[in-house]
Curated annotation (Swiss-Prot):
Homooctamer; tetramer of dimers. It comes from the Bacteria. This is L-rhamnonate dehydratase. Substrate binds at H33, R59, E349. It catalyses: L-rhamnonate = 2-dehydro-3-deoxy-L-rhamnonate + H2O. NCBIfam families: PRK15440.1. InterPro entries: Enolase-like_C_sf, Enolase-like_N, Enolase_C-like, L-Rhamnon_dehydrat, Mandel_Rmase/mucon_lact_enz_CS, Mandelate_racemase_C, Mandelate_racemase_N_dom, RHMD-like. Keywords: Lyase, Magnesium, Metal-binding. Reaction proceeds via a syn dehydration. Binds 1 Mg(2+) ion per subunit. The record marks D302 as: Increases basicity of active site His. The gene is rhmD. The record marks E349 as: Transition state stabilizer. Its cofactor is Mg(2+).
């Protein structure tokens, strides 16, 4: 009988944060909204708060960057470590160090599903269906996958069964699809700048933006709109039809996450050939099942917010059973290792984090070292051939550990 590899147990879990309301501003990292001034990601983008004039010009004005980056590190008995980042900041540190630690330490490094289920069950009474707690659980889950991969010496995508394609092709999210085309991306997704409180004038302005980019990018380059939960069904339907002449590929996250009936109605009334997408701010498998039943075309979970890689794999299987696509929201290497194994993810998202979208900057810069960026809009699977997620923690960042156990 052949010997079976003996796996170590987890000895320590630690949680740090950078950025957020109680630290330095513009820290970037896992909270990619936490950028400095003059950045496209904070420039008059439509949000649920845009109806209040005091908060319509800047997303940071209503506190989109108050959480900061959570960094979770798990250490095995053999002193190998795995880590991950998400958006949960100092509050996420408390949850990890004062609650979730009991489900992690002492477990085998391969006990990922057990730990995941225990974290979900133990936080159910205060987690709801997503948000800060789910972000924290996601971060722990990703750190566990990173550790497991490093212990066995395999990239995470091989732990999931291996790649189903040689490379990942990307569209770019940012204010300049025309620049994205020059960089080799297959499409460009722009934020909307106006909402229902702006009436038909807002629709005309955003449609004019799409028309301008269509002229600059030519007839075949994909163009999409990201509405970031800022609209109602009536406005979203009108906007979709106003943009249809310019071959808009999809309209994204028009409504708040809980408005499932609204998504069903929007899908029913959208122009023929235009896709309706959502999922970035949904958490838990159950919420994605309900979202899938609305008939939307693409589900877009964020692996750092939806419950981690363990949940993302379940969401992809759910979508596949219904003939739907899964195209995760950003998330860099944490998505790369998943989507290259999914048969229903033909492309992926790259979030432009350079201020004017003119250069390629790693999404979670500066917290990750060796974080890859697309070359000519693509990342080959060989780039992912490093143990775990293939990145290291930049300990030169101002890491703060406010709690311990």
């Amino acid at each position: 009988m052949e010997n079976i590899m003996t796996l170590p147990k987890i000895k320590h879990v630690r949680a740090w944060f950078i950025g957020g309301a109680t630290a330095e501003k513009g820290a970037g990292g896992g909270d990619y909204h936490d950028q400095g001034g003059n950045h496209w990601i904070d420039d008059h983008i439509a949000t649920p708060m845009s109806k209040y004039r005091d908060y319509e010009q800047s997303r940071q004005s209503f506190g989109i960057n108050v959480l900061g980056t959570l960094i979770v590190e798990v250490e095995a008995e053999n002193r190998q470590t795995g880590f991950a980042v998400s958006t949960a900041g100092e509050m996420g540190c408390f949850i990890v160090e004062k609650h979730l630690n009991r489900f992690i330490e002492g477990k085998c490094v391969s006990d990922i599903k057990l730990i995941h289920d225990q974290m979900l069950g133990a936080t159910m009474y205060y987690s709801g269906s997503g948000g800060l707690v789910m972000n924290t659980i996601s971060c722990v889950d990703l750190a566990l996958w990173d550790l497991f991969g490093k212990v066995v010496g395999l990239p995470v995508y091989k732990l999931l069964g291996g790649a189903v394609r040689d490379e990942i092709q990307f569209y770019a999210t940012g204010a300049r699809p025309d620049l994205a085309k020059e960089m080799g991306f297959i499409g460009g997704k722009m934020p909307t700048h106006w909402g229902p409180h702006d009436g038909d004038a807002g629709i005309r302005k955003d449609a004019a933006m799409v028309a301008d980019m269509r002229e600059k990018c030519g007839p075949d380059f994909w163009l999409m709109l990201d509405c970031w939960m800022s609209q109602d069904v009536n406005y979203a339907t009108k906007l979709a039809h106003a943009c249809a002449p310019f071959n808009l590929k999809w309209i994204e996250e028009c409504l708040p996450p809980q408005q499932y009936e609204g998504y069903r109605e929007l899908k029913r009334n959208a122009p023929a050939g235009m896709m309706v997408t959502s999922g970035e701010h949904h958490g838990t498998l159950q919420s994605f099942r309900t979202l899938a039943e609305t008939g939307i075309d693409i589900m877009q979970p964020d692996v750092g917010w939806c419950g981690g890689l363990t949940t993302l794999v379940e969401i992809a299987a759910l979508a596949k059973s219904r003939g739907q696509l899964v195209v995760p929201h950003g998330s860099s290497v944490y998505s790369h290792h998943a989507v290259i194994t999914f048969t229903n993810t033909p492309f992926s998202e790259f979030l432009m984090t350079s201020p004017d979208c003119s250069t390629l900057r790693p999404q979670f810069d500066p917290i990750l070292l060796d974080e890859p960026v697309p070359v000519n809009g693509r990342i080959h699977k060989s780039v992912l051939d490093k143990p775990g997620f293939g990145v290291e923690l930049n300990r030169d960042c101002h890491l703060k550990r406010p709690y311990s156990h």
